[in-house]
Amino acid sequence: MGRKWTYCVVYAIIQIQFFRGAWEELFNAGDNNVYALPGSDVNLTCQTMEKDLMVQMQWSKVTDEIDMIVVYHPQYGFHYMQGVACESRVAAVETLKDATKWTLNLRNISSSLSGKYECSFTMYPTGTKTIVYNLIVEPYTQDEHNRTIEIETNRTLEIPCFQNTSSEISPRFTFSWLVEKDGVEDVLFTYDYHVSNSTAFKGRVGLGADYGLRLSPVQIQDDGRTFSCFLRISPLKVWKTSTTVKVFAKPEILMTVENTTMDVLGERVFTCLLKNVFPKASITWLIDGRLFQGNEEGIYITNEEKNSSSGFWELKSVLTRMHNRTSQSNNMTVWCMALSPGPGNKMWNTSSQPITFSLDSGTAPTKRLPNVTGSTLGAQTFPDAEVSPTRYLATSSMTIVDENVLTPDPTPQTSNSSMTTKDVNYSQPSSGTDAKNSSRAASSSDGGSRPFPSTSPPKWLSLPHTSTGPQEPDSAVSWIPTDAYTSGSSDASLTSHDVIIRTTKEFPDVLTTANGTTKIKHGHVTGITVNKPRDGMSWPVAVATLLFFCILLFGLGVRKWCQYQKEIMERPPPFKPPPPPIKYMCIQEPTGRGMPCHEMEVL
């Protein structure tokens, strides 16, 4: 009897404890961090399902002990603990269809409210459910680092996202790469995903080690761009690393020289061209090993600059040198030098090849001069379409000799020049004599050559409406140099017998007076005559003849093929014998009422 009573008491106590919800089940959802700025409002919300009976809900702040803030009972309502300001802490209950939300509103918070807040539900019969929030109240901070990277074009640039990171970085940090130029910002990467659709970086950007940015190849358009990496440690703490790119390009230099006239001025033009320049560079001229200061008489410099569509600069400097008879030396050496900035505060020094020329090559001939030395034109234009105009990189001087002597050019020409000078005649055509006579006289030279020029005077042809007799000291003497060019062995576009006669576009007539002074009077442009030798055929005629024969053979072939097709169509069809006759067999019926066999064969 006593043992049975003991069991009943124990069972009753257990039932009472179940009824009062004494069996507590603790569900800790883990530490949920909530970040908030000082002075802002924060809502802390937790909810539970409606499958159990709600007994009580409460919010508490967890310190050394649990400090209760507010309690809610479905029957008795809300109850705030003493010392809690209702204006700054308000609780609300929202009943949904299948759940109940329990929210704590914190208004105008400060750093003193930072800490852990516990939300608990007392349910019957499941017990107590608890959720803990970690409220962090601190100002927004951004640790920013700026730097500049200098690099050449067509190189690979690697920009790290962060360096010397500490242990406070969470494994769940997020990052993003942005690029900015001229106030326009674009997102390149976010969370390992390439989100940029810009054509300027198509196929050039990628992620490297430790979330670094890899840019290859570097282009001129990348100059001035700022690449920023945002490493978000928390919603209130961001590390930002900004890298500004400065791009440099090593220039290419090219120098040319041309002789624009052959008169007494002896003008020469030197052109220094600087390509693929970035940023801008400066061009300096050196004459006989010394820097040109710009205050020398007879030397003029003009500078031009142009920005191409690719972003590179193109600089052009032109030095014009007028012949000075009082020069101490007969030769002059000229070259140009470019100074351009490079990465790491260094300067690139790019120089052209020195060009040396003679100052005496621009002397004009007098009325009767056995041997006269002149300068060739800087840019020669030829009538033949396949002979491109050339420009001498060094001064090319020639000696006027007798038409029977072949004098080679003592100064080398450029590799682009395919024409060699054979005869140069200063002619003064007379009335009744045309340019054809002068060309025949130029082409009458023999095949042999002597090592030294002849001292025989050149031929002078009188101009129209002028006399060939002796002239007065004050009378004008018109002289026009005609250059006879023959193709060299290296020129495949002209035959070995083609002769091209070219006269200068505009040349001054020399007026000689009795006292030795010289007056200049400009003449007019003469024509260009191309003479074909009697014993040969020019290449255009040969090409036209060959083309005519090819077209003729093709036409004959087409005509033959058409005739063959016509013959095939007109042929009679092949003979086809008729089919053999069909033989019928007679079957006589036993009744004897049918037709005889011979009658059926007739039918």
Swiss-Prot record:
Residues 1-21 form the signal peptide. Residues 251-356 form the Ig-like C2-type domain. Its main location: membrane. It is found in: Membrane. GO terms for biological process: cell-matrix adhesion; inflammatory response; negative regulation of natural killer cell cytokine production; negative regulation of type II interferon production; response to lipopolysaccharide. One of its GO terms (cellular component) is membrane. Pfam families: C2-set_2 (PF08205). Residues 559-603 are cytoplasmic. This is T-cell surface protein tactile. Glycans are attached at residues 43, 108, 146, 154, 164, 197, 259, 307, 324, 331, 349, 371, 416, 425, 437, 515. Disulfide bonds join C46-C119, C161-C229, C272-C336. The chain crosses the membrane at residues 538-558.
